[in-house]
Amino acid sequence: MKLSVKFLLFLMILPLIAGEDMSDNDAPKSVDVQRNVKRQGQSQFGEQCTGHLDCFGDLCCFDGYCIMTSWIWPCNW
């Protein structure tokens, strides 16, 4: 029991020691930055594409163009 409490305390303190800034409901800032980095050759909204990986962020390739979708309509059609 004592060991599990110490382990949980360690897991709670670890991000503070590592210097990661955590907000209430967000992932670490490093993850947000990596998620928003545009890869070379990715298309923006309305630009031409050949597949879902060609589109930036949450955009999907539909009928040769990058479009916005929602979680209700994912890119896997």
Curated annotation (Swiss-Prot):
Record key words, sorted: Cleavage on pair of basic residues, Disulfide bond, Knottin, Neurotoxin, Secreted, Signal, Toxin
Signal peptide feature range: 1-19
Propeptide span(s): 20-37
SS bond list: C49-C61, C55-C66, C60-C75
Compartments reported by the entry: Secreted
Single GO MF descriptor: toxin activity
Tissue: Expressed by the venom duct.
Gene Ontology cellular component list: extracellular region
Disulfide bond found in the keyword field: yes
Domain remark in the UniProt entry: The cysteine framework is VI/VII (C-C-CC-C-C).
Recorded family membership: Belongs to the conotoxin I1 superfamily.
Record protein name field: Conotoxin Cl6.15
Organism expressing this protein natively: Californiconus californicus (California cone)
Upper lineage: Eukaryota, Metazoa, Spiralia, Lophotrochozoa, Mollusca
